[in-house]
A protein has these predicted regions:
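Extracellular beta-rich repeat passengers
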Residues: 1-215
Length: 215
């Protein structure tokens, strides 16, 4: 059987708010699609990870499904972290002070990438990038998350405010005319990502669940 769920208006934020933010080596990808996946992701935003979207063909199938439009990525923004790795993506253990100019940890030496493909991807990395950048799919590779108007509060500990800042392009960036698998189930909102002008996470969401005692 194929995994063929449809995800719309998702915001995925990793721990890397800026170049200097230290993060665990366990962080890898904002999204990793594998094992003959047929899922679709629409009107969604991802940032803050060493890698963006990984189509993992270690067990082949997902890459071809992507090229055949069975696995669909539409109206998705992958945003980097300013000055991280020279391309907005880098290793978790990046060191900046005193790094040699030709060293693996130098700020201008890319280590991660927005779009990552497995060696088994049909046609290789070039085919992946070309299909992702198909004009009709309306996908975006953004140099830094600040360009989107994402609320920086989302990187903080404790109670956050996920509502995009005033004037954010996220508030009006959604498109639905190229999302054939969305169907009637999804409410066709104008905003891209999980939150528009209303903070629907308040007051029921618990942002400190790792320290709260539940009885």
């Amino acid at each position: 059987p194929f995994t063929s769920g449809v995800f719309a208006n998702v915001t995925i934020v990793g721990p890397k708010a800026n170049r200097e933010t230290p993060i665990s080596l366990q962080y890898q990808h904002a999204a990793q699609l594998r094992r003959n996946s047929r899922i679709s992701i629409y009107n969604s935003f991802m940032t803050g990870f060493p890698y963006g979207l990984y189509i993992d063909d270690d067990r082949a199938g997902s890459g071809q499904a992507f090229l055949d439009n069975e696995l669909q990525i539409r109206n998705v923004i992958l945003a980097g972290v300013e000055h991280w790795g020279g391309n907005g993506y880098g290793s978790a253990g990046t060191v900046f002070t005193g790094a040699p100019s030709n060293g693996a940890q130098h700020p201008t030496n890319p280590r991660g990438q927005a779009l990552r493909s497995h060696a088994n991807f049909p046609g290789g990395q070039a085919a992946y990038e070309a299909h992702f950048n198909t004009t009709a799919f309306n996908n975006t590779l953004m140099p830094k998350w600040q360009d989107s108007g994402l609320n920086p509060s989302v990187f903080e500990d404790g109670v956050i405010n996920p509502v995009p800042v005033t004037g954010s392009m996220l508030l009006t960036a959604a498109k639905w005319d190229n999302t054939p698998k969305a169907g009637a189930f999804f409410q066709k909102v104008n905003y891209l990502g999980a939150v528009g002008t209303q903070n629907w996470t308040s007051p029921w969401a618990e942002w400190n669940c790792h320290i709260v005692k539940y009885y």
